[in-house]
């Protein structure tokens, strides 16, 4: 039986527990996941692509079923390069579905082999977004439980905020 692989793309700036939930759910369906860190030149990320890759690898415990990579191109070009045409996208709410549905259809228009698999994050993390985590952390709020411990530690280091108890 061939190994089933999917790509899970995102900015992961920072990686949240919602992202980890999608990775864990994805591994129930696929034998292998490529977590692909997107480099968007129009954004100013808090963490570099290399930092995000390292944080993801550490958070997944260097699981051999998870490859962490990065890309600087259209998703369809990256998918074509990897030869993996199934992409996992996490959904938190109905509003996410509308955007992801449009994106999936555009990607399918650009690359007919493209397939999107939508995965729910679950009730524990449906309200968590990387943008909200960055905002809370920037103002010294406690992000414990919203991000993996290694990410919380790195956020505190990078932003110069104290650890919460």
Swiss-Prot record:
Q: Where in the cell is it found?
A: Cytoplasm
The residues that hold ATP are 11-12, 19, 90-92, 100, 125-131
Domain of life per record: Bacteria
Tell me one GO biological process term. Answer: coenzyme A biosynthetic process
Residues involved in substrate binding: 11, 43, 75, 89
Matching entries from Pfam families are given as:
CTP_transf_like
Q: Which cofactor does it need?
A: Mg(2+)
* UniProt GO MF annotations: ATP binding; pantetheine-phosphate adenylyltransferase activity
**UniProt-listed Gene3D superfamilies:** HUPs
Q: Which InterPro entries match?
A: Cyt_trans-like, PPAT, Rossmann-like_a/b/a_fold
Catalyzed reactions per annotation: (R)-4'-phosphopantetheine + ATP + H(+) = 3'-dephospho-CoA + diphosphate
- UniProt entry keywords in alphabetical sequence: ATP-binding, Coenzyme A biosynthesis, Cytoplasm, Magnesium, Nucleotide-binding, Nucleotidyltransferase, Transferase
Q: Which SUPFAM superfamilies does this UniProt record tie to the protein?
A: Nucleotidylyl transferase
Which residues does this entry assign to the site Transition state stabilizer?
19
Q: What is the uppermost EC class here?
A: transferase
Which NCBIfam families does its entry note? coaD_prev_kdtB (TIGR01510), cyt_tran_rel (TIGR00125)
The entry's family comment says: Belongs to the bacterial CoaD family.
Name under which the protein is recorded = Phosphopantetheine adenylyltransferase
């Amino acid at each position: 039986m061939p190994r089933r692989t999917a790509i899970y793309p995102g900015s992961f700036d920072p990686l949240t527990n919602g992202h980890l939930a999608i990775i864990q759910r994805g591994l129930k369906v696929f034998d292998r996941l490529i977590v692909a860190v997107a480099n968007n030149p129009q954004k100013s990320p808090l963490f570099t692509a290399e930092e995000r890759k390292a944080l993801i690898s550490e958070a997944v415990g260097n699981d051999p079923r998870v490859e962490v990579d990065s890309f600087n191109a259209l998703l369809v070009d990256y998918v074509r390069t990897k030869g993996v045409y199934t992409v996992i996208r996490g959904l938190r709410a109905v509003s996410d579905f509308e955007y992801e549905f449009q994106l999936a259809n555009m990607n399918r228009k650009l690359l007919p082999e493209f397939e999107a698999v939508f995965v729910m994050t679950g009730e524990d993390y449906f309200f968590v977004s990387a943008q909200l985590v960055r905002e809370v952390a920037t103002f010294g709020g406690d992000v414990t439980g919203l991000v993996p411990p290694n990410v919380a530690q790195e956020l505190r280091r990078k932003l110069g905020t104290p650890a919460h108890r």
